[in-house]
Design a protein with these regions (language model features):
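Residues on the lipid-exposed face of transmembrane beta-strands in outer-membrane beta-barrel proteins
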Residues: 346, 358, 452-456, 486-492, ...
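Surface-exposed loop/interface segments of Gram-negative outer-membrane beta-barrel transport/assembly proteins
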Residues: 200, 215, 275-276, 281, ...
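Alpha-helical support elements that line or immediately flank enzyme active sites
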Residues: 298-300, 575, 594-596, 866
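Short, small/polar-rich motifs associated with maturation and membrane association
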Residues: 1-487, 492, 499-501, 505-507, ...
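Hydrophobic, well-ordered secondary-structure scaffolds
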Residues: 301-303, 737-762, 769-770, 774, ...
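Hydrophobic beta-strand positions in extracellular immunoglobulin-like domains
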Residues: 127, 193, 578, 660, ...
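Metallo-beta-lactamase
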Residues: 59, 96, 786-796
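Residue-level recognition of beta-strand termini and adjacent short loop/turns
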Residues: 76, 108, 144, 185, ...
Length: 983
């Protein structure tokens, strides 16, 4: 049936109908004008990091438009930043929705937000650094949306998104520069990220066992780049660390070139154990210096040169150094890390084209001179001695009569051995002598260093090789050092998920210096300038087998020319690192290393030296006849003394680690590691002292005086003749020890919402060195830490955005320390045949102590990290440590030994550290940074049941004295009660 249409204007007159139509036309025209006016309305917007829904509500409240959308379509779109001035609504919406899968339609006063109808595309690829290493946890995101992916442990990523025009991808990783890539239709996109010069929060920290983002660590760790501390005047990295890290004290103990400095981190935690930090290179622990049997000729300088743990390492091969200071950072290294850990990371191979690099430098130092010191000249020195005599200042002993010192000259005059004319004439000679000891004994130091490196490779393999040579002529004449280093490293990636790194390192070192009693710089700074350098003046001396010896002739230049020391060492190591990315979140890593270290050392004093005359002869060289009584009382009438040391140390280190790393989103991350480590170190050495050594006659050995021919002068002491037996037996000693270690460890780091971080570490070292109690054989070390990054809170970013980083952290942990050559059992030294019994003899070295246990240190650490305007960076830390130290207890002589070691001392350390860095210029290729650091450590003894005798305070044993409430290594003296009025 056909429907009939009804007119709306039926029943109305034509005139009325025309009026109504005209009204409708006016209303429609007015409505169109209003809609066009709204669309052309211009507004200003300034919003940062808001959700899309918040932006739409903001626009709706400031315009006449109503927005309609499905909540699920816009729920995941956040971090919208819009900054517009006098722009239309369409311009603002275009900017807000750019890079998303959303579009909009305007219908009257309504704006509808809806999804685009597009097909999906899948994008995948690899994210690596410049050396070709995978960047697990790196993110790729679509600009303007939450879409994207997180790279797995092998650096691979994949995700699907709706196809759209102008798609822009952003790749980022902590410590790396962000990279943006415009999508051009290519479904596989591989990206290489460059290192960033950004602030500390963006760093990746190398702890030795793992690499982890700075923001996920709670412990006290300072990382420095090797390129920032390289100084041409230093040849080893330990010297370059001086003054660079708060809480770490680097002390140069000698002016001799090649000598390792003493390094101490956060005070002293042990009295009798090793106080040096643990050195780790590419995750492999470097063994302690070789233990030597020091003699009078074996100076500490030479021992430090021999025993430097990283003397083989060329600073040019180093990428970065991490200093681990608190328990949270060091607990993973167990019983060897109570003094802190210094972790060195060497440079990685790059996948660039062939590159050849050569660097060299030449350094000329200054020679010391008297203008630098407020020292007296000869005339002032003579005047001072004259005034001291006139004031009646007593001498500690009668001056030796001689013409070469004012005191000796005056004694001769007062004894009427010379006339007044002779006295005045010689005094004038002394006043005008002005010997320049600095000119005679020192020189301008000169050194030159050369480094050559070659590197290159592809994505499948890469390689690098380097050689270094350095030579240093020390400030003291006669002190020289020379070193050659070499390194070869290769990286192979046979498949995408497997990376193999192998390296070989080698070095050769030689050093020439002085015997024990020869110190040119010390002599120059303390010796009277009125002394003629060519004369042999009389120096106080004694000889036990001739009571008439009061002095012997001494000349420093003669002493230097007829004695000396030299050392030569070689080092070779090989390492293998295999990393297998089993899953995107799971990696297995094997690390193995082997090292071989050999050294040969000599120190000697010839028969022409004061040292031999005083200790073995009793008279000056060639000053008596063979028939004289002085000759017959000499232990060593001919020849000098030669000390030799040959050592061989080899060790291996095997680690197996399984690492879990999962980023659940941009804000939550979990890192976990479990592993085991097996280490073994073998030390072999021979120390030998030979008497009768004549270096200037073909290095022959002459025979000492026989026991039958030895005739001490009447009235002299007759004890100590056993030195003849030692001379004939020789000082031969052999060392052959092997130390094995087995450890298991685990770490955990969880970051929640990029604001709350929890760290936990545990390690268990087993040893049968400590007691029969099984609880003492195991040393579990553990730590816990928590941090709150307040700057990531929304209210902080909104109201105080100029605070770019604010982090509060605290840690607690327990560390252990195992003293070497210490046992709970009875130790006997098996000696040679005793003449009295004609049987082998043994002596007690250590009595049993079944309760002996590890030294343990409990540590608290609190820190604040603050960064302002991306320019100022401040770190403030406070720590406190309590150590249960092993001390030495004196024993009655009936025990057969004078002392024993036992647990019983408490050491307290507390301190504050402060670092301020200002970086006004920070570009990709260059930066300007100024840094200031300061620290203060207080230590004192706690409760101890060990009694300290008065003699211990006054005889120079301050390094082992532990007195409650007083600092360690204090200077002690008797209190002055005043003058006795009765006397």
């Amino acid at each position: 049936m056909k429907r009939r249409a009804h007119s709306l204007f039926r029943g109305i007159s034509r005139t009325s109908r025309n009026i109504i139509k005209l009204c409708f036309l006016c209303v429609f025209s007015l409505s169109s004008l209003m809609i066009q006016a709204q669309d052309n309305q211009r507004i200003s917007v300034d919003l940062r990091e808001e959700t899309l829904e918040s932006v739409l509500w903001y626009l709706q409240n400031r315009t006449k438009f109503i927005f309609m959308y499905a909540t699920e379509d816009i729920a995941n779109i956040t971090d919208i930043s819009v900054r517009a001035k006098d722009k239309t609504i369409t311009e603002i919406l275009d900017e807000c929705l750019e890079g998303t899968n959303l579009t909009y339609e305007i219908s009257g006063s309504a704006i509808v937000i809806k999804k685009r109808k597009t097909d999906k595309i899948t994008i995948s690829g690899w994210i690596r650094d410049t050396s070709g290493e995978a960047l697990p946890g790196a993110t790729v995101s679509v600009r303007g949306s939450k879409q994207g992916a997180i790279a797995g442990l092998d650096g691979h990523y994949t995700f699907s998104i709706p196809a759209q025009e102008g798609l822009i991808l952003t790749y980022s990783f902590i410590g790396m520069e962000k990279k943006t890539v415009k999508y051009t239709g290519k479904r596989t996109i591989n990206v290489t990220l460059n290192n960033s010069s950004n602030t500390e929060i963006d760093e990746v920290v190398v702890t030795g066992y793992q690499n982890i983002q700075r923001r996920d660590l709670v412990g006290s760790i300072t990382t420095v780049k090797a390129k920032d501390i390289i100084m041409p005047s230093y040849t080893t990295i330990d010297q370059m660390l001086q003054g660079r890290v708060a809480g770490m004290v680097v002390t140069n103990t000698s002016s001799r070139v090649g000598t390792a400095p003493k390094i101490q981190i956060r005070g002293t935690s042990t009295l009798l154990g090793n106080q040096d930090p643990l050195w780790v290179v590419d995750g492999i622990i470097q063994e302690d210096p070789l233990e030597l049997d020091a003699t009078s000729l074996m100076t500490n300088d030479l021992k430090n040169i021999i025993g430097n743990q990283i003397s083989w390492l060329n600073p040019a091969d180093i990428e970065s150094i991490s200093i681990l200071k608190d328990a949270s950072a060091t607990a993973i290294y167990g019983s060897k890390a109570s003094n802190g850990v210094i972790e060195i990371t060497t440079k990685k191979n790059t996948t660039d084209r062939l590159s050849v690099n050569y660097t060299s430098n030449f350094i000329i130092g200054t020679r010391p001179n008297y203008d630098q010191f407020n020292y007296m000249n000869s005339k002032e020195r003579v005047l001072f001695s004259q005034e001291a005599f006139n004031w009646g200042t007593p001498y500690s002993a009668e001056p030796i009569k001689q013409m070469y010192t004012y005191e000796g000259l005056l004694n001769m005059y007062l004894s009427h051995d010379i006339s007044s004319e002779e006295f005045l004439a010689q005094r004038n000679v002394l006043e005008t002598q002005n010997t320049d000891w600095f000119k005679l004994l020192t020189r301008r130091a000169f050194s030159h260093n050369h480094n050559l490196s070659v590197s290159g490779g592809t994505n499948k393999y890469s390689y690098s090789a380097s050689m270094g040579y350095s030579k240093s002529e020390g400030q003291e004449i006669g002190n020289d050092s020379e070193r050659m280093t070499g390194r070869l490293a290769i990286t192979i990636r046979p498949v995408q998920k497997l990376t193999i790194n192998a390296a070989i390192n080698g070095s050769v070192n030689t050093n020439k210096g002085f015997a024990g009693g020869v110190n040119p710089l010390g002599y120059a700074t303390t010796t009277n300038r009125s002394i003629d350098p060519d004369v042999y003046y009389q120096m106080k001396a004694s000889y036990p087998y001739n009571e008439g010896v009061r002095s012997l002739s001494y000349n420093f230049i003669n002493e230097r020319e007829n004695s000396g020391s030299k050392s030569a060492s070689s080092y070779l190591s090989a390492s293998l690192d295999l990393k297998w990315n089993i899953l995107d979140w799971l990696t297995y890593q094997f690390t193995g290393g082997y090292s071989d270290n050999n050294s040969t050392n000599e120190a000697w004093e010839s028969e022409r030296t004061f040292y031999i005359a005083e200790n073995y002869r009793g008279y000056d060289f060639n000053s008596v006849s063979p028939a004289s009584k002085e000759f017959k009382a000499a232990l060593l009438p001919f020849g000098g003394e030669l000390f030799t040391n040959n050592t061989h140390q080899y060790s291996y280190n095997i680690q197996n680690k399984l690492q879990f790393s999962k980023a659940f989103n941009d804000e939550n991350r979990l890192n976990a590691l479990i592993g085991m480590e097996l280490r073994s170190t073998t030390n072999k050495g021979i120390n030998n002292t030979v008497w009768g050594y004549v270096p200037d006659r073909g290095e022959v050995i002459t025979s000492p005086t026989t026991l039958q021919a030895f005739e001490p002068i009447t009235g002299s002491q007759n004890s100590g003749w056993g030195i003849l037996q030692r001379i004939y037996d020789g000082g031969w000693r052999k060392v052959n020890t092997t130390d094995n270690f087995f450890s298991v460890f685990a770490t955990l780091a969880y970051s929640f919402k990029n604001r709350y971080v929890i760290n936990a570490n545990v390690r268990n070292d087993a040893s049968n060195r400590f007691g029969q109690d099984t609880n003492h054989r195991i040393d579990p070390t553990y730590s816990f830490g928590f941090s709150w990054r307040a700057s990531e809170e929304r209210f902080m970013r909104k109201y105080v955005g100029w605070i770019t980083n604010l982090n509060f952290r605290g840690t607690y942990g327990i560390q252990g320390n195992a003293l070497t050559r210490l046992s709970p059992d009875l130790i006997l030294n098996q000696g040679t045949v005793a003449d009295l019994y004609n049987r082998y003899q043994s002596t007690i070295s250590q009595i049993p102590n079944p309760t002996l246990s590890w030294e343990r240190t409990k540590s608290w650490n609190f820190g604040i990290d603050l960064e302002l305007f991306n320019l100022f960076n401040m770190n403030l830390e406070y720590y406190t440590r309590r150590s249960n130290a092993i001390v030495e207890l004196d024993l009655p002589y009936e025990y057969g030994i004078s002392s024993m070691k036992r647990n019983g001392g408490i050491i307290h350390n507390r301190g504050i550290e402060y670092t301020l860095t200002f970086t006004p210029i920070q570009k990709r290729d260059y930066a300007l940074s100024v840094s200031l650091n300061a620290s203060k450590n207080w230590n004192e003894g706690g409760h101890t049941d060990i009694e300290v005798k008065a003699s211990d305070f006054l005889n120079g044993r301050s390094d082992i004295i532990l007195k409650q409430g007083y600092p360690l290594s204090s200077f002690w003296s008797s209190s002055f009660a005043g003058l006795n009025g009765q006397t």
